[in-house]
Regions:
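Acyl-CoA thioester-binding alpha/beta core of soluble enzymes
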Residues: 1-187, 192-206, 271-281, 362-537
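A structured beta-alpha segment of the ubiquitous adenosine-cofactor-binding alpha/beta core
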Residues: 154, 203-272
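Structural scaffold positions in well-ordered secondary structure
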Residues: 169, 225, 252, 270, ...
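Active-site loop/turn elements of alpha/beta-hydrolase fold enzymes
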Residues: 181, 232, 284
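N-terminal Rossmann-like NAD(P) cofactor-binding subdomain of oxidoreductases
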Residues: 251-309
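The feature captures the short pre-catalytic strand/loop hairpin that immediately precedes
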Residues: 305-322
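Conserved anion/nucleotide-ligand pocket segment
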Residues: 319-372
Length: 537
């Protein structure tokens, strides 16, 4: 939303987000308005809402609005530009940006991927091209690395960013144990795109607790994990969890910065239990700094992380996507952080705490924009559909599909002539013609038809599930030794593995586990979906 000096992204996903906005806007009567408090119904009243709130934003600067968000539970984010990043108090306090020496002079850029002992490495410098070339030897250096199958990760995460860590690591053979509780459990179990509808033919599942097992979003990012339900808020549950820590390699958690310390699970406590333990914490804005207590999720991180400023066409203003790029981005970074931490612990015998800010992880993808801002004192522009450089980049409509096209500038006339007649061609005919002319082209796929097309279909995994049956999921985004890792099992049912994990990993006896379950410290059953407002319509 346009404000006095830029743009602001107001979070509106959670009920508390809407409540705080209404109070700040001075319209508290909207909090309980049945047509507005429901996020899905709210979409039908965009014009009414826009007319009321636009003047409020235009009268205020983005930092002024952000300060309101910082002072409350409201998730909201400034649309930060690269010039904003250079002077941002939070990034400065966390030491994220630093001086980099280049052949063209000094520049400012990100100097580390996350906060951890030994980072950033100094000096930060970019060498002249070819300055560091070495002779290639025929005998590659071998590393003494532990097998993935010998590693175990405890995952205390919710939604997408955190669970994506285990979603990447589990197919490698790493044992990933998802830690849940009755309150809170992973809310992704309840999420459905756009509405609370079910897969066609499975609408009846919302009538009982199979609803929590049928969500495509949850099942997509939790494949191959174990599920262990522990009430860590109780002393007995916490002690049971520490038994798992004793025999695991690490923990990843994507809660707010204060959550683990409040649970008595600060790094020093965990390290006393297991000296080689690696903790990867991935709050929206990191563990410390002025914004560390701020709430953030996909759209907020897109705004604060430089993406919203760059998305769209030249004539447009800032925009966030409907994809939430920061979630999987942070997940990939955190998976790498865990593996780096385990490698370090294996070499040194000492664990470490890694502070991974999702905000900073997103800025990693705009490093050149920060360099440009620091050297030329200007913000990078929007590219729209274009590729960087002097190439032709566009989309063309055909009889059956859209086609993405790129070509060298020298071929502009030839390619544009082909595009002029594209309405009479099929997409495959246009792709062939563009390639024959020396350009490159690809049919634009959609989520419905893409799974049937080669080569994309080879990147999908069909995973059988006891509640939903076979479902297609996007596969691992990489190969190992030429083979793509595949899930070892479906996403776990709630409380599926609690007793087995506590016995095998925590070395608790059958009687100890039974007593913990009887007293409500482990396991349990989620409430009926209807009691939480999930009713299929």
């Amino acid at each position: 939303i346009k404000c006095k000096d830029g743009h602001f992204a107001p979070g509106s996903i959670r009920p508390v987000d809407w409540e705080m906005q209404c109070l700040f806007y001075g319209i508290p009567e909207w909090v309980d308005d049945p047509e507005l408090r429901d996020r899905l119904k709210r979409q039908e009243h965009i014009s009414k809402i826009w007319e009321k709130i636009s003047p409020w934003y235009l009268a205020r600067g983005k930092r002024e609005i952000f300060e309101l968000a910082l002072s409350s539970p409201w998730a909201g984010g400034m649309v930060m530009t690269p010039l904003d990043a250079l002077s941002d108090e939070h990034l400065e306090a966390r030491g994220y940006l630093g001086e980099v020496l280049t052949p063209q002079g000094k520049a400012v850029a990100p100097v580390r991927p996350f906060k951890a002992p030994g980072l950033p490495i100094t000096p930060q410098a970019v060498s002249e091209m070819g300055a560091d070339q070495l002779d290639v030897t025929d005998s590659p250096r071998s590393l003494e690395l532990r097998s993935f199958s010998d590693m175990r990760l405890l995952e205390m995460t919710i939604s997408w960013a955190g669970p994506y860590v285990g979603n990447i690591l589990a197919p490698l053979g790493i044992e990933v144990i998802k830690i849940e509780s009755l309150s809170p459990f992973d809310g992704f179990r309840t999420q459905r795109p756009y509405d609370h509808g079910m897969r066609p033919g499975q609408e009846h599942l919302v009538e009982d607790n199979r609803f929590y097992e049928a969500g495509g979003l949850f099942n997509a990012v939790n494949k191959g994990k174990k599920d262990c339900v522990i009430n860590i808020a109780s002393e007995e549950g916490r002690n049971a969890f520490l038994k798992l820590v004793e025999n695991s390699d690490g923990l990843v958690a994507n809660f707010s910065a204060h959550v683990l310390p409040q649970l008595g699970l600060d790094f020093e406590t965990l390290k006393q239990v297991n000296p080689k333990f690696v903790v990867v914490r991935m709050p929206a804005f990191g563990v410390d700094g002025p914004y560390s207590d701020a709430v953030g999720y996909g759209s907020i991180i897109e705004a604060m992380g430089g993406i919203a400023h760059r998305q769209g066409y030249e004539h447009e203003e800032a925009r966030v996507s409907n994809i939430y790029f920061p979630d999987p981005t942070a997940g990939v970074h955190a998976a790498n952080a865990f593996l780096a931490g385990v490698y370090s612990a294996d070499q040194s015998g000492s664990g470490m705490e890694i502070d991974l800010s999702q905000h900073e992880a997103m800025w990693q993808h705009s490093g050149e924009a920060i360099v440009l801002a620091s050297t030329q004192k200007r913000n990078i522009g929007r590219l729209g559909n274009r590729e960087p450089g002097g190439t032709l980049s566009t989309f063309a409509a055909t009889r059956d599909n859209w086609v993405a096209i790129t070509a060298p500038s020298a071929l502009t006339g030839v390619i544009e002539a082909l595009i002029e007649g594209s309405a009479g061609k099929t997409s495959e005919e246009l792709v062939s013609a563009v390639k024959l002319a020396g350009g490159n082209a690809q049919v634009c796929l959609d989520p419905w038809s893409a799974p049937l097309k080669q080569p994309l279909s080879s990147l999908l995994d069909v995973v059988d599930h006891p509640v939903t049956g076979p479902m297609r999921h996007v596969g691992s985004p990489f190969t190992l030794d030429g083979k793509r890792p595949v899930p070892k099992a479906h996403a776990p049912l709630f409380d599926q593995d609690t007793d087995e994990v506590l016995s095998r990993v925590g070395h608790l006896s059958v009687d100890e586990i039974a007593e913990l379950r009887r007293a409500g410290h482990i396991g349990g059953e989620l409430p009926p979906p209807a009691s939480l407002g999930f009713i299929y319509d």
